[in-house]
Every structure is written in C-alpha cells, then in structure tokens.
Amino acid sequence: MIYGIGIDITNIDRFKTLHNPATFIQKVLTPTEFDEFEAKKGQRAYEFLAGHFSVKESYSKAYGTGLGKKLNFQDIEINYDGVGKPKIVKHPFSGTVHVSISHSDHHVVTQVILEGDN
C-alpha cells in the first residue's frame, strides 16, 4: 500500500548564492552526508547539495508533515549503493522508501514514495 508520494523540483543555481552557506549546509546535511559533500567540487557540489535538499523536501511531503517541528533535515539521510542508486538510510518511516533523483543543468527533481504502514 502506498502511504505517501512526494515530489520536489529545486533550482540548483540558488545554492550558489546562499548568504550563509556553512550554516545552511550544516542544517541540511547529516555529518555523513557532509563528509561526502566535501569531496565534491564545483557544479557537482551544488548538484549534491540541491539533490539532498530536494530529496528531504520530497520525503517530508510523502510523510505528510513537511519539514518543521515533527520532521527536520537531520532526521533523513541519503547515501548511494555500489552503482550510484540513491537510498534513504535514515528516516522515521517504518515501511519501504523508494527515491529517485534527476538533474539537468539548472534543476534537480526528486520523488519519494513511502510504501507500507507507518
């Protein structure tokens, strides 16, 4: 049974003009994600940050709470399997989580499907 579906589109370029990037990055990325982010350079770093931001937005929509008091960025962690497929490895949902990320030059679109009962 589908519990929820969340979709988000984010403009990658907006992450290039953050007023306080260090604070924002610490808010959005878990320590494990931050370690991976630090290894990225240039456009790839912006794509990574925008992608993780967007996945967490999509997850919060699928979960039904949005990001805020009940769910925050640190409650959700994304990593990748051996072939680069994204997976959400830390989250409050007890069922199965499906995630997809796609980038263009200027945008990232993500979808999260939560399957099962919570």
From Swiss-Prot:
Ribonucleoprotein in keyword set: no
Gene that encodes the chain: acpS
Top EC group: transferase
Protein task: Transfers the 4'-phosphopantetheine moiety from coenzyme A to a Ser of acyl-carrier-protein.
KW Cytoplasm (keyword) present: yes
SUPFAM superfamilies tied to this protein: 4'-phosphopantetheinyl transferase (SSF56214)
The protein's name: Holo-[acyl-carrier-protein] synthase
GO molecular function: holo-[acyl-carrier-protein] synthase activity; magnesium ion binding
Subcellular location per the Swiss-Prot or TrEMBL entry: Cytoplasm
Chief site of localization: cytoplasm
Enzyme Commission number, as recorded: 2.7.8.7
Sites where the protein binds Mg(2+): D8, E57
Substrates-to-products reaction catalysed: apo-[ACP] + CoA = holo-[ACP] + adenosine 3',5'-bisphosphate + H(+)
Domain of life: Bacteria
Cofactor(s) essential for the protein: Mg(2+)
PANTHER family xrefs: L-AMINOADIPATE-SEMIALDEHYDE DEHYDROGENASE-PHOSPHOPANTETHEINYL TRANSFERASE, PHOSPHOPANTETHEINE TRANSFERASE
Sequence similarity: Belongs to the P-Pant transferase superfamily. AcpS family.
One GO term of the biological process aspect: lysine biosynthetic process via aminoadipic acid
Keywords: Cytoplasm, Fatty acid biosynthesis, Fatty acid metabolism, Lipid biosynthesis, Lipid metabolism, Magnesium, Metal-binding, Transferase
Annotated GO CC locations: cytosol
